């Protein structure tokens, strides 16, 4: 585990995009994208209201942890919203230092402040204990159709 003293938790900035994409490669397939492609995707996400919080290593500018939040207004539940947390990832050298927990708690607090009645996320089997420690519980099942 690496020292976390030089880390800042903040919103993803345009200057972070390449480093963020590199970090996402620890989570899933994340092929290289051009600067223009990254900027276009970031703009679409911003317009959709998606918030991505990151841990930035201040001396190097490297992104070492991130998670995203999408707020979905509902017609049910009196119009209250649901927070969807996605793409939670921490660089392997920083795992166990509490970054994942801090990211999740920060996004849960944003969800609460936006009036969400619940926060949901998808998880691999191996990550279930981590989320359960944070108060999440397994509920229903996810379905998927690859296009």
Curated annotation (Swiss-Prot):
Record-listed D-glucosamine 6-phosphate binding positions: 28, 86-88, 117-118, 122
Main location: other
Single Gene Ontology BP annotation: poly-N-acetyllactosamine biosynthetic process
Role noted for this protein: Involved in the biosynthesis of UDP-N-acetyl-alpha-D-glucosamine. Catalyzes the formation of N-acetyl-D-glucosamine 6-phosphate from acetyl-coenzyme A (acetyl-CoA) and D-glucosamine 6-phosphate.
Biotech / industrial applications: Potential novel drug target for African sleeping sickness as this protein is essential for the infectious bloodstream form of T.brucei. Therapeutic application depends on development of parasite-specific inhibitors, because this enzyme is also generally essential for eukaryotes.
Classification of source organism: Eukaryota, Discoba, Euglenozoa, Kinetoplastea, Metakinetoplastina
GO molecular function term, any single one: identical protein binding
Knockout or disruption consequences: Conditional knockout mutant of the infectious bloodstream form (BSF) of T.brucei has rapid discontinuance of growth and death by cell lysis after 48 to 72 hours under nonpermissive (without tetracycline) conditions, but grow similarly to wild-type under permissive (with tetracycline) conditions.
Name the UniProt record assigns to this protein: Glucosamine 6-phosphate N-acetyltransferase
Residues that bind acetyl-CoA: 88-90, 96-101, 131-133
Annotated catalysed reactions: D-glucosamine 6-phosphate + acetyl-CoA = N-acetyl-D-glucosamine 6-phosphate + CoA + H(+)
Listed EC numbers: 2.3.1.4
Domain N-acetyltransferase: 7-147
Alphabetized SUPFAM superfamilies for the sequence: Acyl-CoA N-acyltransferases (Nat)
PANTHER family named in the record: GLUCOSAMINE 6-PHOSPHATE N-ACETYLTRANSFERASE
Pfam families: Acetyltransf_1
Keyword Cytoplasm: no
């Amino acid at each position: 585990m690496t020292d976390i003293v030089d880390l800042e938790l903040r919103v993803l900035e345009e200057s972070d995009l390449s480093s963020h994409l590199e970090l996402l490669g620890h989570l899933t397939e994340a092929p290289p994208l051009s600067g223009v492609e990254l900027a276009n995707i970031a703009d679409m996400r911003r317009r959709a209201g998606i918030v991505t919080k990151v841990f930035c290593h201040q001396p190097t500018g490297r992104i070492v942890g991130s998670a995203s939040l999408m707020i979905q207004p509902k017609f049910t539940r009196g119009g209250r919203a649901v927070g969807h947390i996605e793409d939670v990832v921490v660089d392997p050298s920083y795992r166990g230092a509490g970054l994942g927990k801090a990211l999740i708690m920060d996004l849960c607090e944003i969800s609460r402040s936006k009036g969400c009645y619940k926060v949901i996320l998808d998880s691999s089997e191996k990550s279930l204990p981590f989320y359960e420690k944070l108060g999440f519980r397994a509920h229903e099942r996810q379905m998927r159709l690859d296009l």
